Structures are given as structure tokens and as C-alpha cells.
């Protein structure tokens, strides 16, 4: 099964499984009372169909976790992989408040591999623990906008840059007013 809080990712996963692998997935909505009451979505397939899909993706059952070597060879594959991981478990805070992009992961070794993959784009990602989860995160505005470009999210990048400019103009105006008084 694949679980996500992003409805669009769940629907896309459902369609890809059905159309590419000709399996019959089930889409389950999980209602959550905690974590802000946000729903989660689980796409499920049977055991034999799951083995078929994993084999079709080149994933061996019981294989160690990490970034598949084939992904790291070409830049376009690295970019697509990062985009997919972000859609599955990433978030960006409101740039009007702070600059923070994170991936929330269960597996520490995958988090370390993801950090190394991000470093190949000359970005400095950090790793931290939050309860039982491992975070890979970026803090700076320029690093986050660069990462959004890697994802191919140009409109989000421009929105973040606009927010940064507005914030800087407000701060400069406040400094000028404070200096005059």
C-alpha cells in the first residue's frame, strides 16, 4: 500500500497502477482526528499484484532501502526522483512566515541517501529527528527556491521569490521608520 495526505498523489498513483500495470487498486480515505484532522489516502493492491508491480518497477522484495543506483546516473532522473519524493512526503511552509522545506521519512538510511542526492545539486540539506520520524530539510530562501526549480515547480518558485521581495520591502520600510523616530 501507499499512503499520502495528498489527494492528487493518491489519485495519480491509483490511475498509474490501473493503467500501466493493469491491476485493480483500492483507494481508501483515512479520517484522522489528530494532526489537524487532515485526511490521509491509502492506495492498496493485493499481495500478488504488489509483487507484480514491484517487479515491474525493478524493485526486489526485501531489497535494502535507499535511492536506486539507476536514479542517480542521469540528472533528469535525479530531478524526477526528488519531485516524486517531495510529492509523497514533502511540504513547504508559507514564505510570508518562514522559509522551510522538509521531507518527513520513516527510514533513517533513506533520509541519509536523500540528503546525499540533494547535495549533488549543491544544496545543503540537514537531517533531524522528530519523534519516530526523520526529517530532511532546507532552511534558506535561495536553497528552497533552487529546490523548487529542481522539482519543476516554477510558479511556486516565483511565488516564493515574490513573497521574499515583499517581506524585504516591508522590513526596509520598517527600518527606515524606526531610524527616523
PLM region spans:
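DNA-contacting interfaces and partner/effector-binding or oligomerization modules
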Residues: 1-160
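Extended mid-to-C-terminal alpha-helical interaction segments
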Residues: 146, 150-181
Amino acid at each position: 500500500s501507499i499512503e499520502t495526505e495528498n489527494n492528487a498523489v493518491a489519485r495519480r498513483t491509483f490511475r498509474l497502477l490501473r493503467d500501466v500495470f493493469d491491476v485493480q487498486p483500492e483507494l481508501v480515505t483515512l479520517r484522522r482526528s489528530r494532526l489537524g484532522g487532515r485526511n490521509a489516502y491509502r492506495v492498496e493492491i493485493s499481495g500478488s499484484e504488489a509483487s507484480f508491480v514491484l517487479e515491474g518497477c525493478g524493485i526486489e522484495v526485501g531489497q535494502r532501502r535507499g535511492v536506486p543506483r539507476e536514479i542517480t546516473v542521469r540528472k533528469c532522473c535525479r530531478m524526477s526522483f526528488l519531485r516524486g519524493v517531495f510529492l509523497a512526503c514533502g511540504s513547504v511552509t508559507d514564505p510570508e512566515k518562514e522559509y522551510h522545506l522538509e521531507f518527513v521519512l520513516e527510514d533513517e538510511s533513506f533520509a541519509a541517501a536523500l540528503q546525499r542526492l540533494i547535495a549533488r545539486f549543491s544544496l545543503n540539506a540537514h537531517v533531524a529527528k522528530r519523534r519516530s520520524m526523520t526529517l530532511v530539510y532546507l532552511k534558506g530562501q535561495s536553497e528552497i527556491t533552487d529546490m523548487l526549480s529542481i522539482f519543476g515547480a516554477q510558479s511556486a518558485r516565483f511565488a516564493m521569490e515574490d513573497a521574499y521581495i515583499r517581506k524585504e520591502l516591508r522590513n526596509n520600510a520598517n527600518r527606515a521608520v524606526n531610524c527616523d523616530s
